[in-house]
Amino acid sequence: MKFAIESISKNSGRLGQLRIKDGGPDFKTPLLLQTTKGGSIPWLSADVFESHVSQKPQVLQFTLSTMDHMTEALTHWNSGGGRGLSDYVGLPGHLNILMLRDPCETTPSGGNDRDILPLFTRRGKESLSSERYMEMVASFKPDFYEGLCDADTNLESAKKRIQKSVDRTEKFMHYIYEHRGKVNSTLLAPIVGGYNTFARTQSIKHAREQPAGSYGGYIFEGFHTNGLSATTLDTSKLLPIVEHCVKQLEEDKPRLMPGAYTPLTILELIRQGIDMFDSSYAYCASLNFKALTFSFVQDAVEHAPFLDITDEAIKEDFTPPLSNCSCLTCQKHTRAYLHHLYKTNELLGPILLIVHNLHHYMAFFEKIRESVARDELPRLTEFVRNQNGKTQVDYSIAANTKVISKAAMGKGFAAAAV
């Protein structure tokens, strides 16, 4: 992995260029990773993604918690001359990272043991040792992967739990560092420690004590429990910890923070020096029937962060979900149609939502890179913060609790959600 900084400023963070493997494409940072579930971009086939979302090479974020059942098949695939993990899941031409936890779903707490990390999968809880983890990484052969770590911490975690997470991570990583040479993939060193600056420093110190070339970048874990919890983080508590950590890291290695952080939080983290994020926020919005409508192109109009597809007020609204959006959903369909698809529980509903949300979110990152290059990130941040309104916009995502009963529909589809 090669990472080169093109520009850096105190106010706008840094603009970089990342080459994950020799001969591969270069990616501009800040970079958006494409979140997957079970090896697939949620609701989308490869053809739909590449024809209606993006034709450019992407970095796919694979998670062991949703793909652990593929280990045996991947062992045979790669031993037989398979072309790699992305080809196996039907997304050739894209690079990939293997991570432990699904950022889209809440990770249960507990189940920690001295030498074992709990991995919560679709089949239940699996026990993951350092040895077993490296065997699975060798089977998957990702382009780069996350080091094994105990990230079971959040803002409410006690000091004892935080210290255990750091100590256990050091023990896991001691084995990983010793045996990483058996895997032809780049390692990301995990930085854990909750919201405790001393614990974070200890975790960073352990990583930086390793010989040169032991890892290619950093991944920050342990700030939240994934899922919607990342959309409600208190940035006044988060940002000082991130700033404390970044000051202790060398500049020539990329930094990743997985999770469904809000657009505003992402802008503030970029200003702190974080380089990579994932698209789980767009997925969480789609899952809860919300179309992203926040604006990042400055104008004089007040904007809302979301369009609630479940809202009865749009059932006769025949305007696009977002005006001036060039995605398939907004060019071909209306708000009323999306509401109809929701009411009838049609699969096309989430497909159209994720097409729009990914298109919008990827355009947002294009705007971010443009703003960083011009040293105008603070201006963009303030616009995203208020959306031309008088107060700060709430970008947190609430779980959709509306349920449509088929029995209540009768012979038509006019039943209200309950």
Swiss-Prot record:
Binds 1 zinc ion per subunit. Its cofactor is Zn(2+). Keywords: Cytoplasm, Metal-binding, tRNA processing, Zinc. GO terms for molecular function: metal ion binding; tRNA-guanosine(34) queuine transglycosylase activity. Disulfide bonds: none annotated. Zn(2+) binds at residues 325, 327, 330, 356. It comes from the Eukaryota. It is found in: Cytoplasm. GO terms for cellular component: cytoplasm. The keyword Cytoplasm applies. Gene3D superfamilies: Queuine tRNA-ribosyltransferase-like. Pfam families: TGT (PF01702). The keyword tRNA processing applies. InterPro entries: QTRTD1, Queuine_tRNA-ribosyltrfase, TGT-like_sf, tRNA_ribo_trans-like. Coiled coil: none annotated. GO terms for biological process: tRNA-guanine transglycosylation. Non-catalytic subunit of the queuine tRNA-ribosyltransferase (TGT) that catalyzes the base-exchange of a guanine (G) residue with queuine (Q) at position 34 (anticodon wobble position) in tRNAs with GU(N) anticodons (tRNA-Asp, -Asn, -His and -Tyr), resulting in the hypermodified nucleoside queuosine (7-(((4,5-cis-dihydroxy-2-cyclopenten-1-yl)amino)methyl)-7-deazaguanosine). Belongs to the queuine tRNA-ribosyltransferase family. QTRT2 subfamily. Heterodimer of a catalytic subunit and an accessory subunit. This is Queuine tRNA-ribosyltransferase accessory subunit 2. The lineage of its organism: Eukaryota, Metazoa, Ecdysozoa, Arthropoda, Hexapoda.
